[in-house]
């Protein structure tokens, strides 16, 4: 690759991520791995550096402006530092224990089977609309204790608010209305759970808030929103993007179909390949130096997971989709104290959907042989918007 000087770019450019960000990110990673963009925002693009920063959460703070650039920290664990972060995480983790996931497995498999059966019976479907979107929405809706009749509006609120998460300048009337409607809705739910607690996660959060955990109603609202948005967007995009990669590389799908062990490795490669959360931002609480580059106190520093998951120092042929890749030290779920709590649920959903799809089909192909994916116009998440396929 030619070592030409890249014109300074906006590391949060939506157009770049919607199109093909990888040539630009590769140049940055190879030439200026600790990169300051045209707006003065820093970016870490290598796994070693991101792990270092994430382990030093007291220096690379999440609670100053929150997890999004130029933002305002919200009352949720993702936008908090210890000890508040640890207190909130301890409570939310009650919904994601190994015992909880083991108990939940049969139900997740049943939901996946129902969705796949309906799609395969028609001989064709849009993976996003018919499988990848409804699976996590159903499961997250249940965890929130929401009736099925509310799933569509919860989905709309989630999609709208994630669209405004890139930067405050993208907060439109639709985003504001969605936030207001969600806040009104979840506030009513919280009041109900105070009187009628159940087994759902909102009830667990409410009980913890009343038991002096350091949380209050605002933290319940914020963490329920985190569950809704995070649980929806990430799994949907990996189901879709992983399957798109396997269809485009049929020899890789053949390997993934062979055994449960092969599928597990394939899932990890799908996570690396898609990297559904592009980045998180931290703010430095003191002057720091990485790779000889000095980053001043008070700087916004992007953890660019999308760039890091193609790191040449960590992956052989990083731009090749290889379901046999092992080990696969990706950071699709982040790293350190803010490692995604829902990782085990996401893997369970991916395993369930792919298992059912492979079990019920001989082939999965693009409905249109000339299909090319259209990605979300965003710099926080990156996902395929529609994936029409046909089955045999």
Give the location of each predicted region.
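Cytochrome P450
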Residues: 1-392
């Amino acid at each position: 690759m030619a070592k030409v000087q890249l014109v300074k770019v906006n590391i949060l450019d939506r157009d770049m991520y919607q199109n093909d960000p990888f040539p630009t990110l590769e140049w940055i990673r190879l030439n200026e791995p600790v990169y300051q963009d045209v707006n003065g925002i820093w970016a870490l693009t290598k796994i070693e550096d991101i792990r270092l920063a994430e382990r030093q959460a007291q220096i690379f703070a999440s609670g100053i402006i929150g997890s999004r650039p130029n933002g305002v920290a919200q009352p949720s664990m993702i936008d908090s530092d210890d000890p508040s972060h640890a207190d909130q995480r301890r409570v939310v983790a009650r919904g994601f224990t190994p015992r909880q996931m083991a108990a939940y497995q049969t139900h997740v498999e049943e939901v996946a089977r129902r969705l796949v059966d309906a799609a395969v019976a028609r001989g064709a479907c849009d993976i996003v609309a018919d499988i990848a979107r409804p699976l996590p929405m159903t499961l997250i809706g249940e965890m929130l204790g929401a009736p099925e009749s509310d799933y569509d509006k919860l989905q709309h609120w989630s999609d709208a608010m994630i669209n405004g998460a890139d930067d405050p300048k993208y907060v439109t009337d639709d985003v504001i209305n969605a936030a207001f409607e969600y806040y009104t809705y979840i506030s009513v739910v919280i009041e109900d759970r105070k009187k009628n607690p159940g087994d759902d996660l909102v009830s667990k959060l409410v009980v913890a808030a009343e038991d002096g955990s350091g949380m209050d109603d605002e933290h319940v609202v914020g963490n329920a929103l985190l569950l809704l948005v995070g649980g929806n967007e990430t799994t949907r995009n990996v189901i879709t993007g992983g399957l798109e990669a396997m269809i485009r590389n049929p020899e890789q799908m053949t390997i993934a179909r062979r055994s449960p062990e092969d599928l597990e490795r394939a899932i990890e490669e799908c996570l690396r390949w898609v990297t559904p959360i592009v980045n998180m931002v931290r703010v430095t609480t003191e002057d720091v130096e990485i790779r000889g580059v000095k980053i001043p106190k008070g700087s916004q520093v992007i953890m660019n997971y999308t760039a890091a998951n193609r790191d040449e120092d960590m992956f052989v042929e990083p731009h090749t989709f290889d379901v046999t890749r092992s080990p696969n030290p990706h950071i699709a779920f982040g790293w350190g104290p803010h490692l995604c709590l829902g990782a085990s649920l996401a893997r369970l959903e991916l395993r369930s959907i792919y298992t059912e799809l492979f079990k019920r089909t001989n082939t999965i192909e693009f409905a249109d042989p000339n299909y090319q994916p259209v990605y979300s116009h965003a710099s926080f998440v990156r996902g395929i918007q529609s994936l029409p396929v046909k089955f045999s």
